[in-house]
Curated annotation (Swiss-Prot):
Family from the record: Belongs to the class-III pyridoxal-phosphate-dependent aminotransferase family. HemL subfamily.
Protein's recorded name: Glutamate-1-semialdehyde 2,1-aminomutase 1
Provenance organism: Staphylococcus aureus (strain MRSA252)
Pfam families: Aminotran_3 (PF00202)
EC number: 5.4.3.8
Length: 428
C-alpha cells in the first residue's frame, strides 16, 4: 500500500498541531509507522486519502457500533441539521435519549448529558466527593478515565499508595487524593480502605478494562467492589465510557449483574458524535445544580445533533445484536488461536461482548503488569503487516479492537487469513 498523500498531509499537520495530531495515538508512534489520514467510511470499511481500503476494527475508538455511515443515523442527522445545530436551550431530543438510557442502564435513575467521556468522569468524581463529603478516590492501575488531573495518576511502589502524577502539569496536591491499586486485586483494595476508608469518596473502575488492552474482571471482583464500598459508605462508580452498550444490552453492569451507585457513559451513546453522560441514583443526582449545590454545566451539553446520533444508534441495538457479536467474536477468537498456534507464536485472547484484545504472550492477562509482558516489538510488526493486508487495527497494544453490526463473517474470515499471511512474513 502507498501512503504518499498521508505522509504529505502529516508534514503539513506537524507545522500546525503538536505532533501533527489532536490525540496522541493518531500519530502511530508505538507501531513505528506513518500516520494514516482517513477520507471516508462505509459499513465495516474505512478508506484513507491514498485510496486504500481497510476492514475497520478501530471504529473511531469504539463509538461506531453500527459501523460507518449507518443509514438511519445519517438520515436523522440530516433532518436535525436542517433545524439548527445548537440552541442553548433544551430540546425534546434530550428527553428521548435520557429516557432510553434510564430504561437500559440498571443503575441510572437520572442522567446528565455532557460532551465527552472525560467530562463525564470528571463531573462524576466531583459529585461523589460533594455527596459524601470525602476527598479521596480509588482507581485501578491500567484503567484510563480520561485526562482530568486527578485521574492521570500511576501507582507507587506499595500495594495501596497515594498517587504520583502521570503527566507533568498535574500538581502533587491533586495526585495525593487519588489512590491506585492493581486491577482485579480485592486484597489490595481492602488494604486501601483499611488505611484511608473514612476519607474515600468512591471507587472508580472500568468494569472491563479497555485501556490496557481488553482485560475482563475475574470472577467475584466486581461484586467484591460492591461489597467493600457499601461496607465503608463509599460510592461505587462504573466508568462505562467504553463498555456501555458494547458489553451487553444493559451495559457491563447488566451483563455482570453488579449495580454501581454512579455510571459514566460515552462513545456508543453518541454514535460517533461528541457525547458523554453520567447518572445514578436519584438521591445522588439531585445534588447537582440547579437542584443541588454541586456545580456542572456545558455549552454544548445535550446538543441536538449529538442527541439525535445517540438515540438513533441506541434504538437499533437489541438483545439479538449481542448474540451476533458473540457469534462473530467466537469465530475471530478461534481463528486467532488457530493461526498463531500454526506459527508457534504465543497469544492470549481476551473478550467481552464486542470488545476483543490480544496479547502476544502466554497469559493469562488479568492486570496491567501482565499486559505489559506482551511482545510490543512483535505487535508493531504485526500491525504494519496487517495494514498491508487491508485490516485497520488499533496502533497500540493497550487499546482494544471493536466489532460492529456492519461486520460480516466474510470480514472475520478475511481478517483471520490476513493474520496468517502476516505471520508467514514475520516468522521465518
Amino acid at each position: 500500500m502507498r501512503y504518499t498523500k498521508s505522509e504529505e498531509a502529516m508534514k503539513v499537520a506537524e507545522t500546525l498541531m503538536p505532533g501533527g495530531v489532536n490525540s496522541p495515538v493518531r500519530a502511530f508512534k508505538s507501531v513505528d509507522t506513518p500516520a494514516i489520514f482517513m477520507d471516508h467510511g462505509k459499513g465495516s470499511k474505512i478508506y484513507d486519502i491514498d485510496g486504500n481500503e481497510y476492514i475497520d476494527y478501530v471504529l473511531s475508538w469504539g463509538p461506531l457500533i453500527l459501523g460507518h455511515r449507518d443509514p438511519q443515523v445519517i438520515s436523522h442527522l440530516h433532518e436535525a441539521i436542517d433545524k439548527g445545530t445548537s440552541f442553548g436551550a433544551s430540546t425534546l431530543l434530550e428527553n428521548k435519549l435520557a429516557q432510553l438510557v434510564i430504561d437500559r442502564v440498571p443503575s441510572i435513575e437520572k442522567v446528565r448529558m455532557v460532551s465527552s467521556g472525560t467530562e463525564a468522569t470528571l463531573d462524576t468524581l466531583r459529585l461523589a466527593r460533594g455527596y459524601t463529603g470525602r476527598n479521596k478516590i480509588v482507581k485501578f492501575e491500567g484503567c484510563y478515565h480520561g485526562h482530568s488531573d486527578s485521574l492521570l495518576i500511576k501507582a507507587g511502589s506499595g500495594v495501596a499508595t497515594l498517587g504520583l502524577p502521570d503527566s507533568p502539569g498535574v500538581p502533587e496536591g491533586i495526585a495525593k487524593n487519588t489512590i491506585t491499586v492493581p486491577y482485579n486485586d480485592l486484597d489490595a483494595l481492602k488494604i486501601a480502605f483499611e488505611k484511608f476508608g473514612d476519607d474515600i469518596a468512591g471507587v472508580i473502575v472500568e468494569p472491563v478494562a479497555g485501556n490496557m488492552g481488553v482485560v475482563p474482571p475475574i470472577e467475584g471482583f466486581l461484586q467484591g467492589l460492591r461489597d467493600i464500598t457499601t461496607e465503608y459508605g463509599a460510592l461505587l462508580i462504573f466508568d462505562e465510557v467504553m463498555t456501555g452498550f458494547r458489553v451487553g444490552y444493559h451495559c457491563a453492569q447488566g451483563h455482570f449483574g453488579v449495580t454501581p451507585d454512579l455510571t459514566c457513559l460515552g462513545k456508543v451513546i453518541g454514535g460517533g458524535l461528541p457525547v458523554g453522560a453520567f447518572g445514578g441514583k436519584k438521591e445522588i443526582m439531585d445534588h447537582i445544580a440547579p437542584l443541588g449545590n454541586i456545580y456542572q454545566a456545558g455549552t454544548l451539553s445535550g446538543n441536538p445533533l449529538a442527541m439525535t446520533s445517540g438515540y438513533e444508534t441506541l434504538s437499533q441495538l437489541t438483545p439479538e445484536t449481542y448474540e451476533y457479536f458473540n457469534m462473530l467474536g467466537d469465530i475471530l477468537e478461534d481463528g486467532l488461536k488457530r493461526v498463531f498456534a500454526k506459527h508457534n507464536v504465543p497469544i492470549t485472547v481476551n473478550r467481552a461482548g464486542s470488545m476483543i484484545g490480544y496479547f502476544l504472550n502466554e497469559g493469562p492477562v488479568t492486570n496491567f503488569e501482565q499486559a505489559n509482558k506482551s511482545d510490543l516489538k512483535l505487535f508493531a510488526e504485526m500491525y504494519r503487516e496487517m495494514a498491508k493486508e487491508g485490516v485497520f487495527l488499533p496502533p497500540s497494544q493497550f487499546e482494544g479492537t471493536f466489532l460492529s453490526t456492519a461486520h460480516t463473517k466474510e470480514d472475520i474470515e478475511k481478517t483471520i487469513q490476513a493474520f496468517d499471511t502476516a505471520l508467514s512474513r514475520i516468522v521465518k
